[in-house]
């Protein structure tokens, strides 16, 4: 059965992270899940999932930690990553309330799990697209959407008082086919994480919401793995140039709010078809690296919103 879950009552089982006790986990379809608000977080927390999360050092939002919220309250800044539609707009209001006036800003990072390819090498009726669509549909049915809606996010930020909201879309290779060394390595690492995530991400949602059996989910995940493993899946992109002159793409062009996080600028305002380069400067030490945006992509969307003097004035008037 898809919902044969029972809390574990014996010794701590194999595969459970060492910092977990048996009261904190329950078994369902061969994986271990957390009992806190049981059923809300539908992804496993067993050892294999946390092993995959260790790949976060390559600066790709990991699938296990993607739905968790991390806060850093430092110098009036808030840094967080999560699936915000699950949490609701009240969190935006709390973030806004705690930001330092005239200085604080908020940055949100998401992965768009809709795979895409412009040259048709990724079949729209293929297994990867089927997996992504079924997963997003299932999560929608539970009221826990992972489908991105940039316009809704911007509107919610504006509703609580943020202005100068800027969205940056970074395209990410799904596998290691690119010829450029750095981009190929990036694609290989992301490919490793994605292939390990197909089954755990979709097991509970598809079994609970779509009536799939564990065997059917395993079969779909295996076919999706085979599809993304092939470097014959190729595509291209044209990375949009910014409205500002060549150089840094200012996060808040009409204010004096500093931007200590990473900044990006377009290496060429008219990139050649099929490839373009984005240089990134680390705000801590000034090191630069180049990421070529080519290939079959998942899309990371980063939205930055600032508290400007105008926004603070609106907040004071409302108070």
Curated annotation (Swiss-Prot):
It comes from the Eukaryota. One of its GO terms (molecular function) is methyltransferase activity. GO terms for biological process: methylation; sporulation resulting in formation of a cellular spore. Disruption phenotype: Abolishes the production of chaetoglobosin A. Increases the expression of velB. Leads to reduced amounts of spores. One of its GO terms (cellular component) is nucleus. Its EC number is 2.1.1.-. It catalyses: L-methionyl-[protein] + S-adenosyl-L-methionine = S-methyl-L-methionyl-[protein] + S-adenosyl-L-homocysteine. The keyword Hydrolase does not apply. Residues 270-293 have a biased composition (Polar residues). InterPro entries: SAM-dependent_MTases_sf (IPR029063). It is an enzyme of class 2 (transferase). Residues 269-293 are annotated as: Disordered. It is found in: Nucleus. Keywords: Methyltransferase, Nucleus, S-adenosyl-L-methionine, Sporulation, Transcription, Transcription regulation, Transferase, Virulence. Induction: Expression is regulated by the developmental and secondary metabolism regulator veA. The keyword Mitochondrion does not apply. Methyltransferase; component of the velvet transcription factor complex that acts as a global regulator for secondary metabolite gene expression. Controls the expression of the chaetoglobosin A biosynthesis cluster via the cheR transcription factor and the subsequent production of chaetoglobosin A. Positively regulates the expression of smtA and negatively regulates the expression of velB. LaeA also regulates pigmentation and spores production. Belongs to the methyltransferase superfamily. LaeA methyltransferase family. Component of the heterotrimeric velvet complex composed of laeA, veA and velB; VeA acting as a bridging protein between laeA and velB. This is Protein-methionine methyltransferase laeA. It comes from Chaetomium globosum (strain ATCC 6205 / CBS 148.51 / DSM 1962 / NBRC 6347 / NRRL 1970) (Soil fungus). The gene is laeA.
């Amino acid at each position: 059965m898809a919902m044969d879950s029972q809390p574990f009552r014996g010794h701590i089982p194999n595969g459970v992270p060492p910092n977990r006790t048996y009261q904190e986990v329950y078994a369902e379809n061969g994986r271990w899940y957390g009992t806190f608000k049981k059923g809300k977080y539908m992804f496993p927390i067993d050892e294999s999932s946390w092993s995959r999360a260790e790949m976060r050092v390559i600066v790709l939002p990991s699938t296990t930690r993607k739905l968790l919220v991390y806060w850093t309250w430092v110098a009036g800044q808030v840094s967080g990553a999560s699936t915000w539609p699950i949490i609701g707009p009240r969190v935006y209001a709390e973030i806004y309330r705690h930001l330092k006036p005239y200085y604080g800003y908020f940055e949100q990072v998401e992965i768009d799990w809709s795979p895409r390819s412009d040259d048709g090498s990724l079949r729209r009726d293929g297994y990867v697209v089927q997996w992504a669509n079924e997963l997003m549909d299932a999560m929608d049915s539970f009221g826990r959407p992972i489908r991105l809606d940039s316009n809704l996010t911007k509107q919610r930020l504006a509703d609580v008082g943020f202005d100068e909201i800027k969205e940056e879309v970074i395209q990410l290779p799904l596998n290691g086919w690119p010829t450029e060394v750095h981009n190929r390595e990036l694609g290989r690492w992301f490919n490793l994480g994605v292939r390990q995530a197909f089954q755990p991400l979709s097991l509970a949602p598809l079994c609970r919401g779509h009536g799939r059996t564990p065997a059917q989910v395993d079969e779909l995940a295996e076919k999706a793995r085979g599809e993304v493993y092939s470097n014959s899946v190729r595509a291209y992109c044209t990375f949009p140039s910014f409205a500002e002159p060549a150089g840094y793409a200012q996060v808040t062009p009409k204010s004096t709010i500093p931007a200590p996080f990473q900044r990006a600028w377009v290496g060429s305002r008219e990139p050649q078809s099929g490839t373009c380069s984005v240089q990134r400067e680390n705000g801590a030490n000034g090191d630069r690296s180049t990421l070529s945006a080519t290939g079959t992509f998942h899309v990371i969307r980063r939205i930055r919103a600032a508290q400007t003097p105008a926004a603070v004035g609106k907040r004071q008037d409302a108070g």
